[in-house]
Amino acid sequence: MNSPWWKERVFYQIYPRSFQDSNGDGIGDIQGIISRLDYLKWLGIGAIWLCPVYDSPNADMGYDIRNYESIMAEFGTMEDFEQLVEELHKQDIKLVMDLVVNHSSDEHAWFIESRKSKDNPYRDYYIWRDGKDGKEPNNWSSFFTPSAWSYDKTTDQWYLHLFSEKQPDLNWENENMRAEVYAMINRWLDKGCLLYTSDAADEL
């Protein structure tokens, strides 16, 4: 019985920004990755682990995602990504992508809607709480800041972020949010991603 491919192949992690610049702007990009596939194949690489290429304001180097359905402009276009998938297939190199769904960017459309009002349909996509005596709901700290809570004066509540204040935590108790994330995942799988690494999975 043959072992699954992900147990046997050599993986190579690619951080797009610093891997290979194809157009001289000083930023690595998808076309740069494509240009190095022959070399990766020669090395014996059987799968690449691609760090985030999604649209992001880059408050945390791409791990703050503004739009899960778009490619960061600095890295290229969706057509470039589709070409990458095609070229990987020709080289028999599998594609694994970072899945960042513990949180989104605070510029994501869901969070923009969520912070508008307490009765907004997207409010419960994130974790909001009342403060205590004018302070944070509790004493939790984040990985990046002393407090895991940030105040939003629009609705006089605090939102949870286990990373930076630019990365509000998604509420995995919300069924509608989960359904949207699962649908997004399936769309990327349909494009040719074969497997995900779940970033910050232990924080979900």
Model-flagged regions — what are they?
Residues 196-204:
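Conserved small/polar residues in nucleotide/adenosyl-binding loops
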Residues 2-182, 186, 190:
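Acidic/aromatic-lined carbohydrate-recognition and catalytic surfaces
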Residues 191-195:
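A glycine-centered loop/beta-turn motif at secondary-structure junctions
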